[in-house]
Amino acid sequence: MNQAIEAVAGAQEAPHVAAGQSADAEALRAAFQRQRQAYLSDPIPDLAQRRKDLLTLKRLLSENVDQVIAAICEDYGNRSRHETLFAEIITVTDGINDTVRHLKKWMKPQRRHVDRTLYPGARNRLIPQPLGVTGLIIPWNFPVNLAFSQLTGAFAAGNRAMVKLSENSMALAALLKELSPSYFPPEKLAWFEETGGVGIEFSKIPFDLLVFTGSGQTGRAVMAAAAHNLTPVVLELGGKSPAIIDPEYPLKKAVERILFVKQFNAGQICTNVDYAFVHESQRDEFIGQARQYVARHCPDINNADYTSIIDDRSYRRLEETLDDARGKGATVINLSGDQPGNRDQRKFPLHLVLDTTANMTIRSRETFGPILCIQKVADEEEAIRLANDSEFGLNGNVWTRDKSRGYQLATAIDT
């Protein structure tokens, strides 16, 4: 998807389908026009219709759980069934239930302050209304979670949606395209896979709102394409995520919680911890606790519960990241001991990287895998300074029992 959309950055053409454009572009435009006309015919669905749409969305997922899990596993090569159930199924259905419970309240008009100097005697109301047709560009790492949670918001607000999945989610895209017509008409919900040109054309469509989740580089291209139509764009981009561990906090607990998420989905989570700042007196203990955690919880990466890296390119990127760090003086520790990575199955062991420097790739690029930098620090001030030494801040974690101090540290992290 990244390579396909990258070409959009310089596009200046109006978003119409010329004679030489692909069938993909024509299909996208036809789907958009169908949804646009349906929206104009019924612009503000009532509470009953929105609840029906949300519960239908829930049925689409809950009635096809095994097929969805199998499709995601096929796309990954191997995806832990337990991880898919938790991250893609349970959380989504719970979110839909919560939205249904609160929807009536959220739809109510809201009062706002009126400047009586400019508008003497006036009253006002803010009335929530649908935008129209929304476009959702979904990444491969949690495709159901991100697609269905965004659809939950779109349908709750009374919108229609076109969803484009990643080129790494082809099996899931095929399944959802097959299942969806039994639950929603195409003028309400339409799915598209990435075939090499869809991303370009999708970003050109004059949606009422376009939501993109992915890399900053691709996000710039998406925004540039959408700008021609003045399409509002919401970007959820990647970045670096530090963790600061208070020396007074139980180190074993911090290690277990950080590594649980680091190995979840093989670390392919945008908000995952990239590097942990540990007091210099505790670094060796951190390493020891990390070894014990892996020995207990994921001793064999070839187990079906250990998720694969999504594709060969990503696997090579992780290898190159470690090679770059080693070549520039870092110490790399394979927490699986003598068990190397499995290239055929794209199983990558958890690694710790020590003594990193600013010129290493791992310090300037989102890791997006089971690699964790450990940086020893003398105090919290040094931890904050190093944590903020990046323009790519996305998320931050503070492990402490002192809530007041934790809040101060969290607000000091530039994310």
PLM segments and residue spans:
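Structural signal for hydrophobic packing residues in well-ordered secondary-structure cores
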Residues: 39, 43, 58-61, 65, ...
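Residue-level signal for inorganic ion chemistry
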Residues: 50, 96, 158, 189, ...
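Conserved C-terminal structural/oligomerization subdomain of aldehyde/semialdehyde dehydrogenase
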Residues: 2, 37, 46-51, 244, ...
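Residues at or immediately preceding the N-termini of alpha-helices
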Residues: 25-28, 47, 65, 251, ...
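Hydrophobic packing residues within well-ordered alpha-helices of enzyme cores
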Residues: 72, 173-176, 202, 222, ...
